């Protein structure tokens, strides 16, 4: 059962995508972005679910679940290093890679949990535990950003990007822990699933309604995480550091 620990820790890395909310406030000030440009940041992070989730899910049968999770960690780690170039385009590329890595991770991490939880009665509670770990990660995001600015950056808000190597170091620890943990391999086989067959499921009215429900709930979740700090800045005249804690009310 110890093999479940590095898999659950992977959910902590999964929560890093929620840092786009507070980090976009700092990026807007550092690069002189307009509010419209800053509003584009969540798209750079989450739009990749549309393009990569189904293809990765299909390819995962051939690659293997653990290998797919390791790929997601590698992409995420690269995305955490690129913002150190301290340019606006590097920041956007970093957000994009963070989104791609997170997409691959969300597709592959839940199935990998099946490989380490042998008792199917415990699978549901294990998945719930993973979401709790992800929520803790999202809750810690603003604190990590404040640590980067106030401790690593000497209180200079222009050093907000130092949060990324901190997150990158955590990602590296997670990847190494998982890599060196023996995990039983699932049987790999060609499932015969295609993009057309997957999209064809939406012809079922029940599946379509469930899909739309998830789509709108996730949209509200991302929008709340992103816009809450902006509302506090605009309406209550909070500074960026103080407003950054507002999304935590949702995650707590």
Across the structure, where does each feature detected by a protein language model lie?
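Juxtamembrane intracellular "pre-TM" segments in multi-pass secondary transporters
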Residues: 185-210
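Conserved MFS/SLC helix-loop-helix module at the cytosolic interface between two early adjacent transmembrane helices
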Residues: 51-89
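Extracytoplasmic gate region of multi-pass secondary transporters
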Residues: 20-22, 204-251
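Short hydrophobic/alpha-helical segments at membrane-entry points of transmembrane helices
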Residues: 90-95, 209-210
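Helix-loop-helix hairpin linking two adjacent transmembrane segments in secondary transporters
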Residues: 126-182
